């Protein structure tokens, strides 16, 4: 027995005979795992053999008893060195496994616990009678049985269940004997009963006719009176259970045979369950349409283990919709409350409900108004504004702000006095809590110091008149023994005042110590402190701002001052005094401050607000002026004054207080703090700053009792009464507010999961208790309360006062708020002088240049139509701004690609915003402006028309036109705000962003803000973390339910990758939104809109200045080749050949592993689109547009166009590919343009099956009348989303330019591809030749097949596909060259590519550039020099050496003896 195990046995007081038995002869404790949060101690024991069952049970019992004394749990596992197993021992442990296993059902245990077990080699045979359901047992117990036995020390056994003839016979005999007894007893009872009945029987009555239908109805299962089983109680398979709960997830599947399976999940809020219901067909499924998300159902069925999900699932037999109890506000109309303190999911990682839920709940309960008060932000305002208008109730806009003092003083009661001459009393107090009003002084200690020397000391304990709590003793080290015979408080106070005469008082965090002393002085009729007081906490913060922590502990450690017993006043006081004289010396040397009166003026930093204690206050918008002011406050607090949290200095709040109303907030507010720490009189002075006082239900404050900040419920009620008194004294309304963080009480767990995910570093998760018993304090019950629930909370105040606080005062205050416009109703574009004239002039100028003057009618009418919409709706400035950005990027040498539908606008084409021409396919002569338009739909793209010479002058005609209607951009009436998305080169994007600032001004240009919420996968992780940290176990359905509840809460903010919001220069940003930094990064170059940009995108101009690889690639290819990309034809035969085979590349499909030449071609190079190309073999530009649309749409290709093409019903050119095709096709068929447009809009948004049947049938009838085929109509019904044709055209044009170089200038193409597009490299493989490349590709392919490939390997496979193709085409990869390789780009050397340094794994761009700079300074003479000058790590140098890059380079450049001789 090891020493550790022996100590444990003594601690457990194990019986001596067991302790000395052979079982513990070689016993050891292998390890102990302590799970602090769940308070579980996990022992791992090692024994020579399996313990006798009675010793095991005794060890288990004593461990559990011993650890439960401290609130912990003990579990253990056993490892046996040479286990010897007998059948008798095995039988005993088999029964123990049942007792401790998860099979909770009594019926299950009674059936299987007493089966006979024995060993056969390494197999555990379990035998039972033939009546035993071995399959049921195998599924429900075997998986756990083997695992349980291993924990007991048994070896890993294979468990088998089988029937035994012997046991079957024995069971039959026992059953017969028992049955004979039962029958005999029953017969005897029956005879007695018959005799009694015969004596009492009335005359026989005539039997009613047999009613089959009535009997059948009566036999139908009824669930109304069925016993409902809580889901939490079901841990194993059971039959005929009834659940009642809410459906929170639903999926319907139809099998190939037509059967319908409904998989759904329900919760009863004790747990959650997976359920499934099979139905014969979809017709039968309609009978169960009550199964839908949000529905409350009562269901009956059998619970079985699902072999696929490996979780218990109910196979549902009966379903009944039930009415679920909903909380209602039971007070009559006119007597309902108004909630003035509610948080939405925009309170970062703190609250759950969307603002729409809060508004809807208030409206449902008949409340006339509700306020929202998120922490430090107003991001729920826009959605709240729309929700309140829809619900028809008043929304009061507010926030819970963090208020700080601008400059926190170091000295109070300052006087003119030299610091070096003063006498100081450095003191500290110990108390039973933080409240000077409700807690007691238990120690006052001080050191009187002069010139750095202690000249007198004061140290007195004080008897509080009651036993000290464990918390106080743990924290301070002061026990009841210390204070039992101490002096009375009043005597200590008088003696201390005398001790302090003619001295400067000093304390660390002096406001607490001085506040405590003053309250006690006043209570005993003694004068308050009037002499100077120095706060060493603020002294340190201002003197050493570079330190992260300024607590007494960290400071004494930093300055090497002894602090033996922190939180005992005498030790703390002496340590503080030692620090004081260090500070006095440093402040004189660093800042020249030597006088007490100069500390505040010369040392207190203007940024001292950053360290000031934050106090909460609720700020509400009273009118439109207040809205703008709260926007300014939010902006300043999130930018200029942000420090950890958004802070509002008091003077800043004062400067912007017009139109705002201030409430005193929660227990983190200064009014509450003053009431608790200083008393009502002091709180009255503080409360003068506020417009109303908030009190909250006792349940909201109850966690403070757990934290021992409040003694009990009685003291809590006194605090609430005192808060009410503060308001009454000042004549300010007192409002009962709920501090709402979720709607329903059962949603508390979701907030618990979110908050605990922040970890113990978050203030809200600070633990109470010490050591293993430390746990986060409970969270308050913060659901949205009805009026009657709120009145119940405040019933202790009496009915009249409770109604005043809950109903009267909130309603009266709500009436003082004016309506405000949070979101503007119009678009406000910036002003650019003569924008309309410029757009029109540029348009016609370019049109005349191309098409001549006068313009062809088709061109003239299109321009007139577009300009009428653009200029008439104020969109000219949007067009002109985009044109200016594109022009500037073009001037820097980059093409700009368009996205979205802007290519539908011919004006955009003419002024250079897009290169997509949306006119009908046409010819035009570049010499004489002759033009010819094809308007019959015979060509899908002008690029597909045959070449033709000009009939007027013989010059070769240009071909263009994609046949895209303008309506798809600005709507049928041309009044939809244009959304112009532009793809700039990623290299040029930062310059383009700065162009926006340059054009409009930095005070008017902001990055488009985004709000990041907790995603479903993240929420799942939070739930699993909570499960782990707090010792929970949830089945899969419950994890999913909890994750759904926790998802959607704001987690961070960010910025759109290219979106820039432009504020009109005749307004300011606060007319629309506050501003902030993305993700609270105050070092960011750009500020963002505080609101999610979608919330204001119809009010201000948003430019999408996006970064993309295509323009960068084109620029690179142009630089390499000198070819102008605008000269590349869109109908090059060689390029089109790529889409039908590999011959044009000079390779076979076997060589490159794909039947076409699509590898590395933008838009067409993914596996998905390559598969589409293989199936369709496009031959025209129009068909490539179709492919682009099909690949980007949802339910456009799969299960739709793909099937139509396979079945020969349609071909690639006729299926629906892009959204615009629908309108154009239907117009060509003869439909009215307005109807064609409307049908397109319904289909592209996936609304075809969601609109009314009447509307849809009207469209279908019109389509059929115009000979639109049936398959086309059915195809429309399947579509969920469609890609704009203009977007497809822009992408395809870029793709074909890249493909042109792949066909005709391959080395340039591969150089550009690897420099710009490739994401992962393996230089050793790439330079190793074809065999090495193909071998590595095979390795990764095998991994991908088994889902074992990493993301990097998947990216590398894509790179190697292109490498393989390049090598097969006869080009080569060189090795990295220390003196040739570029930092980040591949270089061409004949038919060989030289890789850059950045392609080497682990070598970043910055280090690569450093290597290039270093080599320009001179040759590297050694590896040591390469490391130092090139900034390379030893690992990277070793890699270079392994790859042969360094040749024979020596380790260092010191000459050896031999070097000198030779």
UniProtKB/Swiss-Prot annotation:
Its main location: cytoplasm. GO terms for biological process: DNA-templated DNA replication. SUPFAM superfamilies: Nucleic acid-binding proteins, PHP domain-like, Ribonuclease H-like. The keyword Cytoplasm applies. One of its GO terms (molecular function) is DNA-directed DNA polymerase activity. It is found in: Cytoplasm. Its EC number is 2.7.7.7. SMART domains: EXOIII, POLIIIAc. InterPro entries: DNA_pol3_alpha_NTPase_dom, DNA_pol3_finger, DNA_PolC-like_N_II, DNA_PolC-type_N_I, DnaE2/DnaE/PolC, DNAPol_HHH, DnaQ, Exonuclease_RNaseT/DNA_pol3. GO terms for cellular component: cytoplasm. Residues 424-580 form the Exonuclease domain. Keywords: Cytoplasm, DNA replication, DNA-directed DNA polymerase, Exonuclease, Hydrolase, Nuclease, Nucleotidyltransferase, Transferase. It catalyses: DNA(n) + a 2'-deoxyribonucleoside 5'-triphosphate = DNA(n+1) + diphosphate. Required for replicative DNA synthesis. This DNA polymerase also exhibits 3' to 5' exonuclease activity. Belongs to the DNA polymerase type-C family. PolC subfamily. This is DNA polymerase III PolC-type. It comes from Streptococcus sanguinis (strain SK36). The lineage of its organism: Bacteria, Bacillati, Bacillota, Bacilli, Lactobacillales.
């Amino acid at each position: 027995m090891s020493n550790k195990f022996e100590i444990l046995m003594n601690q457990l007081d194990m019986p001596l005979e067991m302790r000395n038995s052979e079982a513990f002869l070689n016993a050891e404790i292998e390890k102990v795992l302590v799970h602090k949060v769940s308070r579980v101690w996990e022992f791992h024991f090692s024994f020579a053999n399996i313990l006798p069952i009675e010793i095991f049970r005794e060890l288990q019992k004593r461990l559990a008893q011993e650890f439960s004394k401290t609130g912990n749990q003990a579990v253990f596992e056993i490892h046996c060195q040479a286990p010897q197993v007998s059948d008798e021992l095995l039988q005993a442990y088999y029964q123990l496994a049942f007792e401790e296993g998860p099979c909770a059902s009594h019926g299950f245990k009674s059936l299987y616990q007493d089966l006979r077990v024995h060993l056969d080699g390494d197999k555990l045979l379990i035998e039972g009678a033939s009546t035993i359901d071995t399959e049921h047992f195998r599924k429900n117990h075997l998986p756990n049985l083997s695992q349980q036995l291993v924990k007991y020390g048994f070896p890993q056994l294979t468990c088998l269940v089988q029937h035994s003839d012997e046991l079957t016979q024995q069971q039959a005999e026992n059953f017969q004997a028992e049955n004979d007894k039962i029958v005999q007893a029953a017969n005897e009872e029956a005879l007695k009963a018959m005799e009694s009945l015969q004596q009492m029987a009335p005359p026989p009555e005539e039997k009613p006719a047999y009613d089959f239908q009535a009997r059948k109805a009566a036999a139908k299962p009824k669930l109304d009176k069925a016993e409902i089983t809580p889901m939490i109680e079901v841990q194993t398979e059971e039959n005929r259970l009834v659940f009642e709960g809410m459906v929170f997830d639903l999926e319907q599947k139809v099998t190939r045979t037509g059967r319908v399976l409904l998989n759904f999940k329900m919760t009863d809020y004790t747990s959650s369950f997976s359920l499934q219901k099979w139905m014969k067909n979809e017709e039968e499924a309609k009978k169960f349409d009550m199964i839908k998300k949000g529905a409350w159902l009562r269901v009956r069925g059998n619970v079985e283990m699902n072999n696929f999900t490996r979780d218990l699932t109910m196979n549902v037999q009966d379903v009944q919709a039930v009415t679920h109890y909903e909380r209602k506000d039971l007070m009559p109309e006119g007597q309902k409350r108004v909630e003035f303190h509610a948080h939405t999911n925009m309170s970062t990682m703190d609250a759950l409900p969307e603002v729409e839920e809060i508004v809807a709940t208030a409206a449902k309960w008949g409340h006339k108004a509700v306020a929202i008060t998120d922490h430090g932000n107003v991001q729920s305002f826009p959605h709240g504004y729309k929700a309140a208008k829809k619900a028809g109730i008043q929304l009061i806009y507010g926030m819970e702000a963090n208020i700080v003092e601008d400059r926190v003083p170091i000295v109070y009661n300052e006087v003119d006095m030299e610091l070096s001459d003063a006498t100081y009393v450095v003191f500290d107090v110990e108390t039973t809590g933080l409240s000077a009003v409700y807690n007691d002084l238990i120690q006052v200690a001080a050191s009187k110091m002069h010139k750095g020397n202690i000249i007198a000391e004061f140290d007195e304990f004080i008897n509080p008149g009651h036993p000290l709590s464990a918390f106080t003793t743990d924290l301070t080290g002061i026990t009841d023994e210390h204070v039992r015979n101490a002096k009375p408080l009043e005597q200590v106070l008088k003696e201390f005042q005398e001790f302090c005469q003619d001295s400067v008082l000093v304390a660390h965090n002096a406001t607490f110590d001085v506040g405590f002393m003053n309250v006690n002085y006043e209570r005993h009729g003694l004068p308050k402190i009037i002499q100077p007081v120095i706060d060493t906490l603020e002294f340190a913060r201002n003197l050493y701002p570079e330190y992260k922590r300024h607590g007494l502990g960290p400071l004494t450690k930093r300055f090497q001052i002894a602090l033996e017993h922190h939180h005992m006043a005498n030790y703390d006081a002496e340590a503080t005094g030692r620090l004081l004289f260090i500070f006095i010396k440093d402040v004189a040397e660093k800042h020249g401050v030597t006088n007490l009166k100069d500390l505040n003026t010369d040392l207190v930093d203007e940024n001292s607000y950053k360290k000031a204690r934050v106090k909460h206050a609720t700020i509400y918008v009273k009118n439109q002026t207040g809205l703008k002011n709260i926007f300014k406050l939010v902006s300043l607090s999130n930018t200029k004054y942000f420090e950890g949290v958004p802070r509002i200095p008091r003077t800043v709040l004062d400067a912007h207080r017009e139109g705002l109303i201030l409430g005193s907030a929660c227990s983190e507010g200064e009014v509450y703090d003053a009431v608790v720490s200083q008393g009502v009189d002091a709180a009255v002075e503080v409360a003068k700053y506020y417009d109303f006082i908030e009190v909250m239900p006792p349940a909201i404050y109850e966690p403070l009792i757990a934290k021992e900040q409040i003694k009990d419920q009685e003291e809590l009620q006194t605090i609430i009464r005192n808060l009410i008194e503060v308001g009454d004294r000042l004549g300010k309304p007192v409002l009962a507010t709920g501090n709402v963080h979720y709607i329903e009480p059962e949603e508390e767990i979701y907030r618990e999961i979110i908050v605990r995910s922040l970890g113990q570093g978050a203030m809200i998760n600070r633990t109470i208790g010490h050591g293993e018993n430390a746990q986060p304090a409970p969270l308050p019950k913060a659901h949205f309360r009805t009026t009657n629930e709120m009145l119940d909370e405040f019933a202790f105040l009496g009915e009249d006062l409770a109604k005043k606080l809950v109903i009267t005062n909130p309603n009266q205050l709500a009436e003082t708020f004016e309506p405000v416009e949070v979101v503007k109703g119009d678009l406000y574009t910036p002003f650019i002088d003569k924008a309309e004239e410029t757009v029109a002039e540029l348009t016609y100028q370019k049109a005349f240049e191309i098409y001549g003057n006068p313009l062809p009618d088709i061109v003239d009418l299109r321009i007139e139509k577009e300009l009428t919409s653009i200029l008439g709706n104020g969109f000219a400035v949007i067009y002109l701004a985009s044109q200016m950005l594109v022009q500037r990027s073009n001037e820097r040498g980059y093409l700009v690609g368009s996205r979205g539908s802007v290519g539908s606008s011919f004006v955009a084409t003419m002024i250079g915003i897009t290169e997509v021409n949306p006119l009908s396919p046409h010819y035009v002569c570049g010499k004489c402006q002759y033009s010819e338009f094809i308007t019959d739909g015979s060509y899908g793209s002008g690029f597909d028309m045959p070449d033709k010479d000009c009939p007027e002058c013989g010059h070769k005609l240009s071909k263009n036109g994609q046949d895209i209607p303008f309506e798809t951009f600005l709507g049928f009436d041309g009044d939809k705000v244009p959304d112009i998305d532009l793809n700039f080169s990623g290299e040029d994007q930062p310059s383009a962003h700065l162009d926006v600032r340059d054009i409009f001004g930095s005070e008017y240009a902001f990055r488009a803000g985004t709000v990041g919420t907790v995603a479903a996968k993240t929420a799942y992780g939070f739930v699993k973390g909570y499960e782990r940290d707090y010792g929970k176990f949830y089945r899969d359905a419950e994890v999913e339910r909890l994750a759904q509840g926790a998802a959607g809460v704001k987690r961070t903010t960010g910025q759109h990758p290219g979106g820039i919001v432009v504020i009109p220069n005749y307004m300011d940003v606060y007319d629309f939104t506050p501003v902030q930094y993305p993700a609270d990064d105050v070092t960011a170059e750009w500020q963002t809109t505080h609101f999610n940009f979608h919330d204001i995108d119809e009010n201000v101009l948003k430019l999408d200045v996006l970064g993309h690889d295509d323009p960068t690639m084109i620029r690179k290819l142009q630089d390499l080749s000198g070819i102008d990309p605008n000269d590349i034809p869109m109908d090059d035969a060689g390029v089109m050949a790529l889409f039908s085979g590999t011959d044009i590349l000079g390779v076979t499909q076997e060589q490159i592993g794909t039947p076409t030449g699509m590898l590395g071609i933008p838009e067409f190079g993914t596996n998905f689109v390559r598969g589409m190309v293989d199936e369709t073999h496009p031959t025209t530009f129009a068909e490539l547009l179709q492919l682009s649309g099909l690949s980007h749409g949802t339910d456009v290709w799969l299960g739709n166009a793909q099937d139509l093409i396979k079945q020969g019903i349609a071909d690639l050119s006729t299926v629906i590919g892009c959204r615009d095709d629908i309108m154009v096709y239907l117009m060509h068929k003869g439909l009215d343009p307005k109807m064609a447009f409307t049908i397109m809009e319904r289909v592209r948004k996936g609304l075809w099956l969601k609109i009314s049947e009447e509307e849809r049938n009207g469209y279908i009838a019109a389509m059929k009348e115009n000979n639109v085929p049936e398959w086309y109509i059915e195809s429309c019904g399947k579509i969920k989303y469609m890609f704009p044709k203009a977007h497809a055209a822009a992408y395809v044009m870029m793709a074909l330019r890249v493909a042109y170089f792949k066909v005709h200038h391959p080395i340039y193409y591969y150089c550009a591809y690897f420099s710009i597009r490739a994401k992962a490299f393996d230089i050793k493989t790439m330079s190793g030749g074809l065999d090495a490349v193909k071998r590595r590709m095979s390795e990764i392919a095998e991994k991908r097949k088994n889902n074992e490939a990493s993301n990097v390997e998947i990216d590398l496979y894509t790179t190697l596909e292109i490498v393989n193709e390049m090598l097969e085409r006869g080009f080569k990869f060189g090795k990295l060259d220390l003196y040739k390789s570029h930092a980040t780009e591949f270089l061409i050397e004949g038919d060989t590519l030289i890789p850059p340094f950045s392609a080497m794994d682990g070598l970043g761009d910055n280090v690569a550039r450093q290597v290039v700079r270093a080599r320009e300074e001179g040759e590297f003479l050694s590896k040591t020099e390469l490391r130092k000058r090139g900034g390379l790590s030893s690992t990277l140098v070793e890699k270079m050496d392994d790859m042969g890059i360094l040749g024979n380079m020596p380790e260092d450049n010191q000459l050896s003896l031999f070097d000198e001789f030779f």
